[in-house]
Amino acid sequence: MDERTMREIYLASFEGMIKKEKPWTIMNAYNKLNGTYLCENKEMLTDVLRREWGFDGYVMTDWGAMNDRVEALKAGCNLEMPSCEGATDAEIVAAVQDGTLDESVLDKSCEEYLNVIFKYEENRDKNAVFQREKD
């Protein structure tokens, strides 16, 4: 897809929402853009979403959309959904150990994820009671 079509037709509504509403999380899609799965698309997740639009939350996959966990981390995808229950953890560790994933990328991803948790705690209604707390 050419740049003009992408920006004028497909990205415009997302850009407005990100810049105006400042969501804490966003879910990427299953599909590919110009041959790259969106979970692994650094141009979209890092260059456009974070650098151009100022998104500072975390990005999670749509359910089952993860294809390559290490490439997704490099691209700026923080959270795999549903949980892989540790299945890709070994891939991440191996990639850090063999140098294909810089540990600072993993640190940054964790920081982005934790920042949302801290924002939630700072902004939550202290009088709200969750069902589990009632039981």
Q: Where do the protein language model's features map onto the residues?
A:
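Glycoside hydrolase catalytic-domain context in secreted enzymes
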Residues: 1-135
